[in-house]
C-alpha cells in the first residue's frame, strides 16, 4: 500500500512538472509575466530520465543497427621507425592508452581488440618494394616482441595462479629464456590444430603453460628451498619436459639429498642428468655403497660432488680402483669420500697422478700416500704451484730439511692446504720478533707442527702475554721458553696454564722463582696437577727434602713416582747415601747403580781413614750432557697435552 502511494505521488508530481514546462515552452510572447519554476534534486533527476526516454523512443531502430567497421586503409609506405611502432602495436598484449584523435586508437567497445590495428602481413612480404634485409630485420623484431609477450603471459600466470609476488615472478621470468622460447614455439604449433586455428596467441600460450604444470612446479621447487635463479636454470635444463624434474628430485630425495644441494646436484651433474636412466644411477649408488660409502652418507656425497651422476659405470669403477690400489681398505675409502666428496669425481686422473707423484718426492711410499689421503683427503684439492711449492720454499728458508717436511706432512697435513701469506707467515714473523732465530723456528715447527694451525690473536699472543705477566717469565727468557717447548702456545690458559701457576704459587714458590723454573723447564706448566700432588707429598714427607731442592731441579715432576723416584730413593736409604735430585734422577739405572757403588766405597774408605773428606770427588763433576741424555730416555707419562 505504501509503495503504491509513493508511485502515485511521483507520477502526479512528474505530470505536474511536465505540464508546467510545456506551458512555459508554448507561452505567448506577448505574455507579460513568465512564471519560472525551480526544480530540486529529485525532480530534476526525473526530468532528465523522462527526456532521455523520449529521445530513445523517437528512433527505436537505430539501437538495433550493427556496427560495420570501415575497410582497412590502403598500405602506405612508412619509414623504419613507424614500421617498428606499428609492428609492436600489432603484437603486444596490453595496449597503452592513445591520445584523442590517434589513428590506431582502441576502445573497450571493440569486438576485436586488434581490429583497428594493421595486420602483421602488411609489414612482412605483401609487396615487393622492401628489400630482403629489411624484412629479416622486421622478422627479428617481431620475434623479440613476441618473446616479450610470452614473458608477460608467464609472469601473469605466476602472479594470478601461483600467488607469487610481482618481484619474484619477474625475477623468475627474466631467467627463463629457453623455456620462453619453448612456450612460444609450442603456442605457434597449436595453431595447426582445428580447435586452436582461430584462437589468438595469448590463449594458445596460456594453454601450453597450463598443460605443462609450470606454475605448480615452481611452487613445489620453492617449497624445497630453491632460489628463483636455480629454479629458472633447472626449468631451462628440462627443455620443456617439466615432469622429468619432479621424477629426478624424488630420486635425489630417496638417497638423502636435502635442501639446497638438490639444486646443486641438478646444475653440476651435466645437461643430460634428466635424460639418464634411473637404473644406471641406482647401480652407481649401490657400487659406492659396496665399497664403504654408507647409504646415509650418499646424499652428502652426491650433494657435494654431483659430477658422479654424469659418469658412466665404467668410469666410476676406474676411479674407485685408483684409490683402492694405494692400499686403502673399504672403510678407509668410505670415510675418505665422506670427508671430501670431491676427491672421487671432481679431479681428472692426470691431476691426481701428478699430485700423488709430488707427494712421493717427500720420501713417502704408495701405501703411505694412501694412508695420508685417507687421513686428510683435502690434500687432493690443493694446487701444487699455488700451495705446495711456495710452502716448501718457505720451509727451506727456515732451515727445515726434507725429513722435517715429511714429518710435518705426516703429522699435520693440513698445513699444506692453508694459505701461506695469511696464516703461516704472520705467525713466523711473530716468533722472529720475540728473538727466536730461524733455525730454532724450523726446529719448533718440526717438533710441534700444530703451532701453525693455532690462531695468532686468540691463542699464541694471549699465551705469551700470560707467561710474561702471570708466570714470571722475563722478556729475556721468553724466546728461550717458547723455543724449548712450543707446545705451550697450544695450551688453554683457563684450563691448563692458570691452574698450574696457582698450584706452584700455593707451594710457597715466589713469582720470580717460578719464572726461573719455567725458563729452566718450560714443560712445568703442562703437567696435570693431580699427578703433581703425590710427587710433591713424597718429596716433602718421605724424602724430607726442602722446597729449595725442587726450585733448583723442577724436572723432578717429569719423572714417574712409582718407577723411578720411589725405587731410587729406597736404594739410597738402604745404602745410606744421599744425592741431589738432579744426580738422583737424571741418569739411567746403570749409571745410578755405579754412582751408588762409588759413593759407598768412598764412605767406607773415609771411615777407614784412608781418604780425607776433601779428597772425595764431588757430585758436581757430572756433566750436563749426561743429564740431558738421561732426560731423553725418561718416559714422561704424567704429561698431558
UniProtKB/Swiss-Prot annotation:
Record-level Gene Ontology MF annotations: double-stranded DNA binding
| Pfam families associated with the record | mTERF
UniProt keywords (A-Z) are: Chloroplast, Plastid, Transcription, Transcription regulation, Transcription termination, Transit peptide
What effect does gene inactivation have here? Answer: Embryo defective. Developmental arrest of the embryo at transition from the globular to heart stage.
Q: Which GO terms describe its cellular component?
A: chloroplast; plasmodesma
Q: Where in the cell is it found?
A: Plastid, Chloroplast
The segment annotated Disordered runs over 54-80, 606-641
Q: Which GO terms describe its biological process?
A: DNA-templated transcription termination; regulation of DNA-templated transcription
Q: Where is the composition biased (Acidic residues)?
A: 610-641
State the function annotated in the UniProt record. Transcription termination factor involved in processing of plastid transcripts. Essential for embryogenesis.
> So what family is this one in?
Belongs to the mTERF family.
State the protein's name. Transcription termination factor MTERF2, chloroplastic
The organism is Arabidopsis thaliana
Q: What is the lineage of its organism?
A: Eukaryota, Viridiplantae, Streptophyta, Embryophyta, Tracheophyta
Amino acid at each position: 500500500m505504501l509503495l503504491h502511494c509513493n508511485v502515485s505521488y511521483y507520477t502526479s508530481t512528474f505530470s505536474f512538472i511536465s505540464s508546467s514546462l510545456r506551458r512555459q515552452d508554448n507561452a505567448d510572447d506577448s505574455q507579460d509575466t513568465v512564471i519560472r519554476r525551480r526544480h530540486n534534486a529529485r525532480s530534476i533527476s526525473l526530468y532528465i530520465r523522462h527526456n532521455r526516454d523520449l529521445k530513445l523512443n523517437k528512433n527505436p531502430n537505430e539501437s538495433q543497427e550493427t556496427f560495420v567497421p570501415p575497410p582497412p586503409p590502403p598500405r602506405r609506405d612508412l619509414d623504419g621507425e613507424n614500421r617498428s611502432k606499428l609492428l609492436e602495436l600489432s603484437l603486444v598484449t596490453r595496449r597503452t592508452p592513445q591520445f584523442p584523435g590517434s589513428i590506431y586508437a582502441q576502445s573497450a567497445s571493440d569486438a576485436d581488440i586488434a581490429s583497428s590495428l594493421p595486420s602483421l602481413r602488411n609489414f612482412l612480404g605483401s609487396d615487393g618494394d622492401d628489400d630482403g634485409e629489411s624484412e629479416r630485420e622486421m622478422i627479428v623484431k617481431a620475434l623479440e616482441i613476441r618473446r616479450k609477450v610470452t614473458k608477460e603471459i608467464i609472469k601473469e600466470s605466476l602472479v594470478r595462479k601461483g600467488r607469487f609476488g610481482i618481484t619474484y615472478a619477474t625475477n623468475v621470468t627474466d631467467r627463463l629464456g629457453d623455456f620462453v622460447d619453448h612456450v612460444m614455439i609450442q603456442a605457434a604449433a597449436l595453431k595447426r590444430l582445428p580447435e586452436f586455428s582461430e584462437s589468438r596467441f595469448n590463449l594458445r600460450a596460456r594453454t601450453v603453460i597450463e598443460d605443462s604444470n609450470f606454475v605448480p612446479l615452481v611452487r613445489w621447487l620453492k617449497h624445497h628451498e630453491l632460489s628463483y635463479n636455480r629454479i629458472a636454470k633447472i626449468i631451462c635444463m628440462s627443455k620443456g619436459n617439466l615432469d622429468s624434474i619432479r621424477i629426478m628430485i624424488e630420486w635425489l630425495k630417496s638417497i638423502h639429498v636435502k635442501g639446497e644441494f638438490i639444486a646443486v646436484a641438478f646444475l653440476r651433474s651435466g645437461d643430460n642428468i634428466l635424460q639418464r636412466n634411473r637404473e644406471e644411477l641406482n647401480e652407481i649408488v649401490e657400487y659406492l655403497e659396496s665399497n664403504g660409502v654408507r647409504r646415509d652418507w650418499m646424499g652428502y656425497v652426491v650433494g657435494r660432488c654431483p659430477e658422479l651422476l654424469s659418469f658412466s659405470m665404467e668410469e666410476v669403477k676406474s676411479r674407485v680402483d685408483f684409490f683402492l690400489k694405494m692400499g686403502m681398505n673399504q672403510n678407509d675409502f668410505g670415510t675418505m669420500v665422506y670427508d671430501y666428496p670431491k676427491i672421487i669425481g671432481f679431479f681428472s686422473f692426470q691431476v691426481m697422478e701428478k699430485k700423488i707423484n709430488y707427494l712421493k718426492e717427500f720420501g713417502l711410499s704408495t701405501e703411505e700416500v694412501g694412508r695420508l689421503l685417507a687421513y686428510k683427503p683435502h690434500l687432493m684439492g690443493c694446487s701444487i704451484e699455488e700451495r705446495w711449492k711456495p710452502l716448501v720454499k718457505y720451509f727451506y728458508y727456515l732451515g727445515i730439511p726434507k725429513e722435517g717436511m715429511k714429518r710435518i706432512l705426516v703429522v699435520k697435513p693440513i698445513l699444506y692446504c692453508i694459505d701461506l701469506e695469511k696464516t703461516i707467515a704472520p705467525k713466523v714473523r711473530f716468533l722472529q720478533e720475540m728473538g727466536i732465530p730461524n733455525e730454532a723456528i724450523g726446529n719448533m715447527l718440526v717438533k710441534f707442527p700444530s703451532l701453525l694451525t693455532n690462531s695468532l690473536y686468540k691463542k699464541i699472543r694471549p699465551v705469551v702475554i700470560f707467561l710474561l705477566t702471570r708466570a714470571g717469565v722475563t722478556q729475556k727468557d721468553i724466546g728461550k721458553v717458547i723455543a724449548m717447548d712450543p707446545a705451550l702456545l697450544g695450551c688453554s690458559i683457563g684450563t691448563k696454564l692458570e691452574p698450574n701457576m696457582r698450584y706452584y704459587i700455593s707451594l710457597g714458590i715466589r713469582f720470580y722463582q717460578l719464572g726461573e723454573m719455567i725458563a729452566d723447564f718450560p714443560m712445568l706448566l703442562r703437567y696435570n696437577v693431580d699427578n703433581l700432588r703425590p710427587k710433591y707429598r713424597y718429596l716433602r714427607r718421605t724424602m724430607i727434602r726442602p722446597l729449595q731442592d725442587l726450585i733448583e731441579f723442577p724436572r723432578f715432576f717429569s719423572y714417574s713416582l712409582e718407577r723411578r723416584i720411589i725405587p731410587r730413593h729406597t736404594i739410597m736409604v738402604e745404602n745410606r747415601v744421599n744425592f741431589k735430585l738432579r744426580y738422583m734422577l737424571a741418569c739411567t739405572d746403570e749409571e745410578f747403580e755405579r754412582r751408588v757403588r762409588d759413593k759407598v766405597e768412598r764412605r767406607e774408605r773415609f771411615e777407614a781413614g784412608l781418604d780425607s773428606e776433601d779428597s772425595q770427588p764431588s757430585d758436581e763433576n757430572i756433566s750436563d750432557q749426561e743429564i740431558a741424555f738421561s732426560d731423553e730416555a725418561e718416559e714422561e707419562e704424567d704429561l698431558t697435552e
